[in-house]
Amino acid sequence: MLRVLRSIHIGVANRGVWPLTLCTPQRGFRPVALVDISQQALQEARARVGLPESACFNDAQQALEQVQADCVIICAPTRFHLPLTKLALSKRLPVLVEKGMAPDFASAVEFVRAVEQAGVPVCIAQNYRYGPMERTILSCISDPSHPAHTGFVYCMDYVQHRVRPEPRTLTYPFASVWDMSCHHFDNLLAWFGPAEWMQAASFAAPWSAYPHDNNTSAIIRMANGTTVNYCHTHDASRGQLVVSLHGQRGALWLNDAGEIHFSQRPTEQFGTRPAQVVPRVEAPGQAGVLADFYRYVTEGVEPGISARNNLQVMAMCEMMVRAITTGRRVYRREIDQQGESRT
């Protein structure tokens, strides 16, 4: 019989909606308390999961003290992730935290240190890696028997333009890096392994409402030899995702319709080869985040989204921040040395 974990949900609006929708007994979860500063958000969450008003709180500590639970799911703004996680860890409760782990690398190191000291499972909800596009690309890169196997990828273009004119909670320095680039970097780590170095720049549109630069570009050299041309914007005039890989065996790319295509690498000057559509693999999406968190809590199987593993993502974010602020190439080994000095 499936063990059902009683979950306290801190932050139930916006990104806090998906866990409430997916946390069902069939998946091993049952919400028992809701925490939010917004009464409207609490009312909507209550209606979604069928909890009484007595299960709603405006204060996380009060909820943790009054409600018996088996885990905590935190979907508050990034700057609150560390203190809220520490609060849950003080009750020795496993935690699932929305991405990004923290608003800066020092906080991320402190976050992981607190998790290790508590000795309880903590995961970061990096849901992109559970998507069909991401899983299909991983298969094409890593499986030599795949019909669309790329071989070694020497170059990749990875661009996401986002129409996000309202800053909302993204008002702190490099918020777009810690909040959104963390997804892209998590994908790169899954596809190619760790990064070796990064050069980067930040910029803003004349019409931007953000107090800090919220657009970034970078050249990233992965340790396996792949070079990534990366760009991410929030001031875009049109939403667009560009994913294009050039491998020894062929090219893999995403078209505007969201289809993944593959063509073999020509060997003649200015040659071309016919493109074929690559079927997407089945992927769990956000349900996969919950499944891996559940397995970590109940079986002790550490997933790629554990806090310890996610520190690798935060290290890439720190590489970008440091490359932008110093105007130089930043090597991963520098970040490792900084992390070691803080532990």
Features from the language model and the residues they span:
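C-terminal helix-rich "cap/oligomerization" subdomain common to oxidoreductases
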Residues: M1, C71-I73, Y294-T343
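Rossmann-fold dehydrogenase core element
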Residues: E110-N127, S145-V153
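Beta-loop-alpha module in the N-terminal Rossmann-like domain of NAD(P)-dependent dehydrogenases
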Residues: P19, A55-A114
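Contiguous beta-strand/loop segments that form the cofactor/metal-binding neighborhood of enzyme cores
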Residues: F185-E259, A287-V301, D336-T343
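Active-site loop of classical SDR/Rossmann-like NAD(P)-dependent oxidoreductases
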Residues: I37, V277-A291, I305
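Hydrophobic residues in well-ordered beta-strands that form the structural core
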Residues: V97-E98, V122-I124, L254
